[in-house]
């Protein structure tokens, strides 16, 4: 990965820590994995400096290790944009003072964990937009738009990271191969609530006290309503 930026010394130290593993699948929009070369960690400040100087790829930071974010399909991008627009409209209609951010904005889920969700929502006064603010500090809802390359991660380890963040109350997974939304909710007993929504359903997000039709998220996207019988499971 070609690094750009004035801080060549920092980039050289980062290259001593990690290397990028690229496969043919990367060119079809799958995840680019970054593996550490030596058993040493990058600090949060070093990661922030990397993000400021490198404009080609964004890196999530998890417990000292960085993971490059890949580009998605056109359907993925459209669904993410539809989700942002739909959430903003619902929040405005409900008079909610919340902010909706896209995947350009990092979200802090712990002092040593920062991700770039497809969509993050925060209702915290400290997360109002300002030139000096670079990260969402108190997300209440996270949305990830699924893809073949990231679905296992979004359902597995990444969901575990989000569950450990005390401010997150709901986690939404949006399918791209057919129209279905899954909502996981935190309750007094933990993450025990789950609900799947299908075409024709109205989605209810309890953490934001908003609702909207599932169809709004798939507007102008060529995604079938159901899974083709020959396609198998997600």
Model-identified regions with their sequence ranges:
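Gly/Pro/Ser/Thr-rich low-complexity, intrinsically disordered segments predominantly at protein N-termini
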Residues: 2, 9-234
